[in-house]
Amino acid sequence: MIQKETNLVVADNSGAKKVRCIHVFGGTGRRYAAIGDQIMVTVKAAVPGGVVKKKDVCKAVVVRCAKEKKRKDGSYIRFDENAVVLLNAQGEPRGTRIFGPVARELRDRKYMKIVSLAPEVL
């Protein structure tokens, strides 16, 4: 579960390395985000010469979450870290590569570009 002030790693090559959640989209009192949910983040660490810089505020989608999520077939999916992919204003990924596996739930949420760029879909 991702909430405000949660630190996350970035799973793309947009230039950001670490981000912090500052807002969870999806309702007035919504507190937690899970895999496939959009959040607002601020960049805490970035590589020099990247697309995004430190202190930038942008939207992101959660692609890996440490809290387990139950699937319809009864199985659970859980990752070792909380990771996001940064999005532009149109909802497309800002980077051109995705690092690490992503969850199958992104396909249901219509993030086909992220699913196609990912090296592995679990």
Curated annotation (Swiss-Prot):
It holds the Pfam family Ribosomal_L14. GO terms for biological process: translation. The keyword Ribosomal protein applies. One of its GO terms (molecular function) is large ribosomal subunit rRNA binding. HAMAP family: Ribosomal_uL14. Binds to 23S rRNA. Forms part of two intersubunit bridges in the 70S ribosome. This is Large ribosomal subunit protein uL14. The gene is rplN.
